[in-house]
């Protein structure tokens, strides 16, 4: 089957923004005007086609990125709608990794909001060219020009203004297209499908001329010939200017800024035109880099059907009808349904069952996918997010660069309400963890509890909610906990004899063990220094086993012991009464006695915290970290933001995300990873003991 749409006519784009700026509504309108939806879905009615999970329709927010294909001006546009809530940045990060360009939507009333900054930085990290759409021009307090200023101040970007609004708030009727130098007015009765060109209104003529001159001046920087023509007093042609703007957008020299009101159906068609005119096709961006499987040799995969197949799995979704779906961006080559492919990260062969082209939540079955496509594979068993899929021929094996996923920062215990729920919960959690790499599941050995970890309170709340709805699991959810540890601070030697005589063969074992502090991070070390056979070799493993079984419960508060050394120096045995079990019991008792006298201490997990904050809130952020027993180690500048690195005890980090958001009006963000265990100060240790005893 031949290619139906040439590669240069592909656009793989994401629509990203702060929560509530109108991303999903904008996507809905795009689908409506490109003919994919026959009826417009509204977010506030809970019928938007891109928001297809129940929780999304209820909460009016987008959690997962749904991928959709639409057509406009004979171009194929693959759109990924991404969530704007801070707890779901992982979804945005995944989408940006596989996109070629993005549309950033701003709320014209709020301007550049905190999550817009976060998303913008993520797009910078992946080098994604973008265009800006200033939405909600019909709302009270809408201000297009302030929004443009904020793009400069907060994002450090260079805006290229392409539109000026005509009328504001409820009087918003259309826009001035500066490049074509005309006014575009929408007809309300046609649901925004019809609009017409008119002369620019008299009160805007001067302003439009001024902004148009700026537009041309910025655009011609991209082309020497156009620049000479412009400096010679001649205006370059429309086509030349368009080519200059395209070049500048793709090289990220500037960002075109458009305006409209998606909800009122105005400005969506010019936005679609801009996607096609200015955002890159797969062939316009650098080839994706990877390494040849099993080597360190770097290779590039080009967007062409002629190279062997290579793609990246960027999302796993459970579909109620098809089962597990793996969303894949095909970078090169052709892949057919029913064929075998290699997962080079998991080192497994996979068979592509069915191949689907997704439209939000309906699907179309296809027989093959080619370079540039974003498709869903059904039937993959071992593939998870971030894996490379490629042609199984040995010479074609490649590993594309993986995505980085943040470590979870909050954990809660969950326990099933009944035995039946227990089995279902295991399956549900495994499925959810496969879909979402920022969600982890562990079993706590000490308490036997299942602990789930995620990116924030909303994140875990929604996952527990999905567990209840999709998998029908009833569970109780606990409060967040800290995993403390214990160790010793000085050496102590114990001589302990275990004797038990009850007629017949008894039990006898004598051990002399020296306990001493170990290296940080060394865990538990056991050494046998018995000379002359006072403890026969076959009994020594019993001594080690006894200590190992006792060290799970420390003497202070029953937390596991770490970083100590036990040396067996001497002992005695009895020909008849000694056994491995007797030595195990003796060493266990010696451990309890010795550790209690070796200066036991409580340890707590210390987290390495990195806070990225605008300069204005620097003092407050540092003051707050100090009040949490934190130590600031380093301060750095990143763009127009400050980066603070500090060590803070995990126990003092609960609820930090909310404090930080309110302290910085939501503009600061943080990440936190475990660094090491450190001694708990005496006053805090006493508090913990009292709490556990009480």
From Swiss-Prot:
One GO cellular component term: cytoplasm
Function comment: Catalyzes the GTP-dependent ribosomal translocation step during translation elongation. During this step, the ribosome changes from the pre-translocational (PRE) to the post-translocational (POST) state as the newly formed A-site-bound peptidyl-tRNA and P-site-bound deacylated tRNA move to the P and E sites, respectively. Catalyzes the coordinated movement of the two tRNA molecules, the mRNA and conformational changes in the ribosome.
Keywords: Cytoplasm, Elongation factor, GTP-binding, Nucleotide-binding, Protein biosynthesis
Residue stretches spanning the membrane: none
Record flagged with keyword Cytoplasm: yes
Protein family: Belongs to the TRAFAC class translation factor GTPase superfamily. Classic translation factor GTPase family. EF-G/EF-2 subfamily.
Protein source organism: Paramagnetospirillum magneticum (strain ATCC 700264 / AMB-1)
NCBIfam families linked to this entry: EF-G, PRK12740.1-5, small_GTP
PROSITE patterns per the UniProt record, alphabetical: G_TR_1, G_TR_2
UniProt keyword Nucleotide-binding, yes or no: yes
Broad class of where this protein is predominantly found: cytoplasm
Protein known as: Elongation factor G
One example of a Gene Ontology biological process annotation: ribosome disassembly
Listed SUPFAM superfamilies: EF-G C-terminal domain-like, P-loop containing nucleoside triphosphate hydrolases, Ribosomal protein S5 domain 2-like, Translation proteins
Domain tr-type G: 8-283
Chain sites annotated for binding GTP: 17-24, 81-85, 135-138
Cellular compartments annotated: Cytoplasm
């Amino acid at each position: 089957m031949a290619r139906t749409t040439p590669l240069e006519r592909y656009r793989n784009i994401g629509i990203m923004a702060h929560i509530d700026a109108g991303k999903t509504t904008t996507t809905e309108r795009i689908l409506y005007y490109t003919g994919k939806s026959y009826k417009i879905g509204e977010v506030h009615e809970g019928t938007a086609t891109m928001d297809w999970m129940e929780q999304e329709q209820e909460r009016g927010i987008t959690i997962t990125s749904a991928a959709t294909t639409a057509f406009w001006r004979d171009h194929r546009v693959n759109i990924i709608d991404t969530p704007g809530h801070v707890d779901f940045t992982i979804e945005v990060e995944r989408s940006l990794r596989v996109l070629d360009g993005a549309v950033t939507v701003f709320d014209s009333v709020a301007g550049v909001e905190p999550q817009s900054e976060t998303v913008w930085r993520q797009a910078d990290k992946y080098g994604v060219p973008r265009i800006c759409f200033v939405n909600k021009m019909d709302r009270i307090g809408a201000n297009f020009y302030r929004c443009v200023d904020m793009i400069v101040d907060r994002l450090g970007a260079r805006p290229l203004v392409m539109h000026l609004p005509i009328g504001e708030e409820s009087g918003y009727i259309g826009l001035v297209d500066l490049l074509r130098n005309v006014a575009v007015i929408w007809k309300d009765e046609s649901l925004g499908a019809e609009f017409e060109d008119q002369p620019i209104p008299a009160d805007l003529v001067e302003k439009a001329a001024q902004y148009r001159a700026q537009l041309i001046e910025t655009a011609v920087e991209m082309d020497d010939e156009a620049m000479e023509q412009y400096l010679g007093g001649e205006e370059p042609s429309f086509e030349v200017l368009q080519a200059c703007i395209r070049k500048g957008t793709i090289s990220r020299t500037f960002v075109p800024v458009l305006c409209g009101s998606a909800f009122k159906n105005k400005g969506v068609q010019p936005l679609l035109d801009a996607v096609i005119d200015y955002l890159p096709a797969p062939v316009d961006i650098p080839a994706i880099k990877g390494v040849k499987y099993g080597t360190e040799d770097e290779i590039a995969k080009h967007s062409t059907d002629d190279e062997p197949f290579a793609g990246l799995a960027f999302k796993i979704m459970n579909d109620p009808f098809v089962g597990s779906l793996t969303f894949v961006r095909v970078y090169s080559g052709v892949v057919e349904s029913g064929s075998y492919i290699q997962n080079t990260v998991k080192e497994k062969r996979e068979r592509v069952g069915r191949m689907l082209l997704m439209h939000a939540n309906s699907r179309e079955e296809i027989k093959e996918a080619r370079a540039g496509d974003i498709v869903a594979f059904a039937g993959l068993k071992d593939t998870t997010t971030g894996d490379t899929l490629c042609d199984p021929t040995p010479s074609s094996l490649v590993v594309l660069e993986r995505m980085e996923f943040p470590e979870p920062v909050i954990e809660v215990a969950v326990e099933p309400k009944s035995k039946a729920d227990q089995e279902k919960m295991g399956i549900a959690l495994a499925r959810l963890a496969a879909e979402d790499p920022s969600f982890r599941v562990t079993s706590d050995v000490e308490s036997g509890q299942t602990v789930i970890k995620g990116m924030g309170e909303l994140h875990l709340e929604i996952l527990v909610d999905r567990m209840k709805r999709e998998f029908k699991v009833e569970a109780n959810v606990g409060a967040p906990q800290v995993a403390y540890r214990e160790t010793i601070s000085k050496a102590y030697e114990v001589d302990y004899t275990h004797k038990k005589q009850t007629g017949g063969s008894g039990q006898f074992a004598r051990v002399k063990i020296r306990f001493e502090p170990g290296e940080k991070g060394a865990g538990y070390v056991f050494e046998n220094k018995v000379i002359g056979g006072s403890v026969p070799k076959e009994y020594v493993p019993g001594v080690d086993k006894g200590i190992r079984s006792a060290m799970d419960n420390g003497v202070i508060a029953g937390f596991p012991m770490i970083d100590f050394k036990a040396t067996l120096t001497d002992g005695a045995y009895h020909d008849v009464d000694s056994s491995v079990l007797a030595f195990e019991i003796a060493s266990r008792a010696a451990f309890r006695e010795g550790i209690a006298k070796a200066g036991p201490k409580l340890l707590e997990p210390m987290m390495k915290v990195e806070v990225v904050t605008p300069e204005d809130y620097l003092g407050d952020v540092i003051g707050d970290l100090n009040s949490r027993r934190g130590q600031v180690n380093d301060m750095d500048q990143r763009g127009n933001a400050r980066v603070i690195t500090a060590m803070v005890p995990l126990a003092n980090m609960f609820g930090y995300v909310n404090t930080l958001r309110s302290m910085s009006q939501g503009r600061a963000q943080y990440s936190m990873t475990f660094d090491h265990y450190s001694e708990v100060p005496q006053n805090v240790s006493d508090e913990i003991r009292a709490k556990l005893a009480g």
